[in-house]
């Protein structure tokens, strides 16, 4: 499996499970820079916006200082 695809699936699963996605932590975990994680976040957001039956949104939560999934 492509590293990027595996990383996006892993990030997706983490946010679906209720985890707060902090870019710096994710970048360190996967050995990439924060820009790569931001692109992954954008891909996950695009997935949710292209699914007409999904009311989910991945958005930044200032209080939690990371990205969370809103239903």
Q: PLM ranges: what are they?
A:
Residues 1-71:
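Short, basic/aromatic recognition patches that contact phosphate-bearing ligands
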């Amino acid at each position: 499996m492509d590293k990027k695809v595996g990383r996006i699936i892993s990030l997706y699963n983490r946010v679906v499970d209720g985890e707060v996605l902090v870019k710096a932590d994710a970048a360190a975990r996967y050995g990439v820079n924060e820009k790569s994680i931001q692109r992954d976040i954008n891909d996950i957001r695009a997935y949710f916006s292209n699914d007409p039956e999904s009311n989910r949104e991945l958005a930044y939560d200032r209080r939690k200082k990371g990205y969370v999934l809103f239903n």
